[in-house]
Amino acid sequence: MASPPPFDICGDLDDDPTPPAPTPLAAPTPNGLNDRLLRLTRTHQRGPSQNPNPNPNPNPKPPPPPPPQEPEPAKVKLAGRRRLCKLSTAGDESAGDDDSIRDILDDLTTRLDSLSVDRPTARPRPHVSPLPCALHADPDPSQSQLNDGTKPSSSFVDCDDDDDDAGGAYGGFGVKEEVTRKVFKASSSFGGRGNDDKMKAKGAYAFDTVSRKTTTESKASKFFGDYDDEDDIDQDAENGKENHADDVGWEKTEDFKMEPTGTGVTRKPYNLPGRIFNMLYPHQREGLRWLWVLHCRGTGGILGDDMGLGKTMQVSAFLAGLFHSRLIKRVLVVAPKTLLTHWTKELSVVSLKDKIRDYSGPNANARNYELKYAFKEGGILLTTYDIVRNNFKMIKGNFTNDFDDEEETLWNYVILDEGHIIKNPKTQRAQSLFEIPCAHRIVISGTPIQNNLKEMWALFYFCCPEVLGDKEQFKARYEHAIIQGNDKNATNRQKHIGSNVAKELRERIKPYFLRRMKNEVFLDSGTGEDKKLAKKNELIIWLKLTSCQRQLYEAFLNSELVHSSMQGSPLAAITILKKICDHPLLLTKKAAEGVLEGMDAMLNNQEMGMVEKMAMNLADMAHDDDDVELQVGQDVSCKLSFMMSLLQNLVSEGHNVLIFSQTRKMLNIIQEAIILEGYKFLRIDGTTKISERERIVKDFQEGPGAPIFLLTTQVGGLGLTLTKAARVIVVDPAWNPSTDNQSVDRAYRIGQMKDVIVYRLMTSGTIEEKIYKLQVFKGALFRTATEHKEQTRYFSKRDIQELFSLPEQGFDVSLTQKQLQEEHGQQLVMDDSLRKHIQFLEQQGIAGVSHHSLLFSKTAILPTLNDNDGLDSRRAMPMAKHYYKGASSDYVANGAAYAMKPKEFIARTYSPNSTSTESPEEIKAKINRLSQTLANTVLVAKLPDRGDKIRRQINELDEKLTVIESSPEPLERKGPTEVICLDDLSV
């Protein structure tokens, strides 16, 4: 059988010009990424058409048959990759173009992965040996080759030898193209984490050479590595650093290094780049050492430096060293909203900009993203107190598993700026912060004691609760004795006991509390360029009430509102009296009606016409828009009248002035008066947006005009630097002395080169004089608890609590001014310009001038004790050494008698103010018996509390004896005595 003729494809096509019928197409399907990639590679391989003739051939030749399809390369799963990766060899020349395209796609994939917080953590690849990865000055990736001369393909994880990685890894050192050789030692931890994160895998690389060029241009991109708390780092690689600075002509900057101290868990040293360390003042460098000691002890503390000494910069630099040393991973910074911008600025200065995560915006989704990123990658989370209060469960990690379970605590540090905000531990703000787990807590506050000692205890209880114990212990051991000893009318024995207890308190908190004052850090003796801070003179301007203010003040004291407030809360009546002292137009309708009620007994006075007219106008009973005096009322308010005379003098001399008031309504009145005089001004209050505040502050600091800046104390007194102004006017005093101090320190801070004069306006013989006395009393408590010298006792609480009474000397004389003049009159040292300025002030019809800066400038001398007082004090002092050694359980009275029979025990307490029928001799006998029981060491050793309850009973009996001995004879009282607690008044 003959075989069939061979089938000639080309012959058949030549014989029959008719093309065959097209094959029916399948249903169109969407092209995937691989299909588009295959089409692109084939088109790239074929290249453009070689036929230059654009006209088609009428008889075209059929296309050549397609080449046999080659098998697709195998795909494998690599750690750190989302997609399957094709394997290729370096000798496969045909895949060169495919490799370049795949490299582009892989690079895009890794970049997208780096933007996601959900990407998997890089895992080590045990089957791939570590590859030496070198960075060269030539940024061309094609020059990077392996030791065997082959080009690395996409089957290996990319090394950091591209432009972005080289610049990112050394951006913090300010190194540009002068880099000649930088070697990293690679561990077995490889994984694709994107260009920005490849060099930051945990424990992946250790610097072998650290040389840098000192320049002001430095990137903050990848200066610090991630948190690393493992001990398997090659210490020889870290310590055996080879210096190549001489080869390239670099100027080397030495790092600041501190070794671990004590027996804490920290075993790695602290390293801070020298560029950052050189930015700090000497007192800030000392602050770094103090913070490092706390870190090694595993506890926290209070940074209480005076306002304007750069507390934020100290903490930022300390965090920079911790991140640089790989000692921490996450930090939570809680601050008022107005201070977050300042924190961002300071953290950026120390090259921590890329560590910042903002958790303060209004968008909840954006905040949650930042929080999740901080959990995943670490960093510094900036937020506010209110956001923590509402979201503390999320911040403590209740709803996420993004952090490693091996970590002991979620947050390494919780830092509270303006930490006195949590001075009341019962508030939701304080309780929410207590819920957040952390290893260290740092409180930043220039005023840790604002009203009473309990506020200082609250701050210590937050950051280091083991220092002062619980609240009851602190009150019984420290607070009561110090307050009694600080009273001007205290007995000699009370003063000695208070002084010794205060000394013990200072020694107790000394390791955990750091406070430096500006006059201690920057001495006033400097001149010229050596003078880092100017002088400050604070003056109390004692003003005389106008006739209108006097009539309103007296009328309100006779009103029913004052009499009813004496039986209840006096705050409403106190507020009205303060408004009358500032400006009568501040009175509300209800307050004006109360003033009218008190005018019945004063109708025969000559000047009642205008006063009654103003009161009726305020109460909406009369309307007289033509009365200019009622609209602005410079002659109605002594403060406004004096202020306009002072501004005329200051502006004419070219000074810039800050004016602070507690209320926006008072600022409105001042603003109207300034507009009438034609002065330019700027203003910030609670209605000003934060973005606008920054612009307004910049305009004042750098702008050519607007010599007057109006601010409210609650907004403008916090976080602003206004060193262009050298004159500050505080219109109305606050119950909280730190409020006024913060306002003053907007101008008196680092960077102020002019001498600052502060004017605190006070009205003589009014409620404001009582407020000023209370400020001084609170300031004495703070200094007694924190400063190592005996403080002057200016006032007693009995002087302060006489609020609702007319001054016997009238409104033209200030007894406080006379007392301060007698106390500090001989200390006045003024230059000619200040002396002339005070003479000008005294010509404005004021009651007098006091020098607030001289308060507490003298060291008081304790009076000598008689024999009986000396015996009592010697007996009481040993108890100060043993009182606090017990546990934190509550002390109870009569513990010795019922130590072995706790079920039959009935607690008995003593009130210092209660009347006792026991004589001092009987109380002393009880103390002696209990002391003998306490001396029986065998019995005390068997007690569960080791005698703490007995010591508590002895202390209570001793306090009771002190009250009885110091109490005067009972006086006949004409009526019910008003009892007002002024310690908690902080507004």
Curated annotation (Swiss-Prot):
Position of sequence motif DEAH box: 417-420
Binding site for ATP: 305-312
Compositionally biased residues, Polar residues: 141-156
Comp. bias regions, Basic and acidic residues: 99-110
UniProt entry tagged with the keyword Cytoplasm: yes
Enzyme Commission designation: 3.6.4.-
Compartments, as annotated in UniProt: Cytoplasm; Chromosome
GO MF entry, a single one: DNA translocase activity
Main location (coarse class): cytoplasm
Knockout-associated phenotype: Lack of seed endosperm, alteration of ovary and embryo shape, reduced root and plant growth, but fertile plants.
InterPro entries referenced in this protein's UniProt entry, alphabetically: Helicase_ATP-bd, Helicase_C-like, P-loop_NTPase, SNF2-like_sf, SNF2/RAD54-like_C, SNF2_N, SNF2_RAD54_helicase_repair
GO cellular component, one term: cytoplasm
Sequence segments annotated as region (Disordered): 1-172, 224-245
Tissue-specific expression: Expressed in ovaries, roots, shoots and leaves.
Helicase C-terminal domain location: 645-801
Comp. bias (Acidic residues): 226-237
Any Pfam family matching the protein: SNF2-rel_dom
All residue ranges annotated as the Helicase ATP-binding domain in the record: 292-466
Coiled coil: none
Protein family (similarity comment): Belongs to the SNF2/RAD54 helicase family.
PANTHER family assigned to the protein according to its UniProt record, in alphabetical order: DNA EXCISION REPAIR PROTEIN ERCC-6-RELATED, SNF2/RAD54 FAMILY MEMBER
Designated name of the protein: SNF2 domain-containing protein ENL1
Lineage, top ranks: Eukaryota, Viridiplantae, Streptophyta, Embryophyta, Tracheophyta
